[in-house]
Amino acid sequence: MSAESAESTVTGAGLSEPLAAALAAATEDRLVYDLAGIAARHDALRRELPGVQVRFAMKACPLDEVLTALARRGAGADAASPGEVEQALRAGIPVGRVHYGNTVKSDRNIAEAYRLGVRTFATDSVQDVAALAEHAPGARVFCRVATGGTGAVWGLSNKFGCPPGDAVRVLEAARDAGLVPAGLSVHVGSQQMTGEAWHAAAEDLGDVLRALGRRGLRVDHVNLGGGLPALGYRDRRGTPLDPPLDKIFAVIRESMDELRRIHGGPLDFVVEPGRHLVADHGAIRAHVTRLTERRTAGGERQHWLYLSCGKFNGLYEMDALQYRLVFPGHHPDGPYVPAVVAGPTCDSDDAYSHEEGLVPVPATLASGDPVWVLSCGAYATSYTTLGFNGFAPLPHAWADRPEGTGADD
């Protein structure tokens, strides 16, 4: 397919025209973002969950331009370190819309965030509460309740959060230490594919709200965390992931109504989307390093497609996902060969999980041919290495620039 036909094909599949045009115009490797698409996804989320406050999970895409675009739409920031707090403020997010969402933080982290003006902190232990009372006196705290992570591509169920029964004890400790026990939070796992996960989390939150009421504690908000899925991923076998987004939003709305009923009064809600906002609005213009053929230990022929980007420079999550690939200039009707897709480094982990499924690629690919890697806008910048094996991080560009190739210097 020609560059033009490639552009029209991916646009029809959900890639925005500006992003497709920028990829087609690029002559060198780069990560391209569509800021208008990110803003539109944010606005769609606000329509689905009216009245809910959005705190963008900065780790998903810590670029100033993305933060500024979201700030202009009214979003805040879920920051996990003083460095992220500083960046959010520089990008124009008011400090009142920044919370410290990481339950893991040192005394110095707490004191520095408090100095910067942050007054709302996540917690999940009485030890952290004691540190907050000392270094962020009078701060508002919300307690993270652990979830199982079932139904998510990444469960995230071990490092953060306390059992529902312990959340009451943590918030009582916060009250007794002079802090404001302001809320509860959950995280149902990243790229959550089921509505049932939010329903189960809401049931746990309801139990905690009842228990808090019996102890005379009333919170003012519930943070429903991240987990909202991107739409353009494929699983490790290459099957498109098709999250039931309408059902997920319906379950969240019903859950909010039920939690307000249990609470018996006003209750605000917060969400912390990351990949849901940015993944599908970022893509990489890469190139073919080499398409090779060699035999496995069992004697079978196997093709390997080595790209100029991989796990260490843009595709960190390639061990759990397959990203959709587009090959401009190659006809979609073939000939194609099944191949293992891998990155350029001298590291065996820099490859798709090829035991699960091979990827059909044009048999005529040559070194230097362009390749578009779609729906990789989440974690492509934040998870990249600074020069592993001498491969530099990809520059980034913005789809709304006329030439479509304006890279970060």
Residue ranges and their predicted role:
Residues V251, R261-D409:
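Charged (often Lys/Glu-rich) extended helix/loop segments that serve as interaction or gating elements
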Residues T147-T292, N389-F391:
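Active-site loop/helix belt of alpha/beta enzymes
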Residues L67, R90, I110-Y114, L132-H135, ...:
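Short acidic, glycine/serine/threonine-rich loops at helix termini
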Residues M1-E134, G138-A139, D176, V180, ...:
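A charged N-terminal "starter" segment
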Residues Q53-R55, G74-G76, V95-H99, T120, ...:
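Structural preference for beta-strand elements that scaffold enzyme active sites
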Residues A57-L63, A80-G83, T103-K105, D124-V126, ...:
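Active-site beta-loop-alpha junctions enriched in small/polar residues
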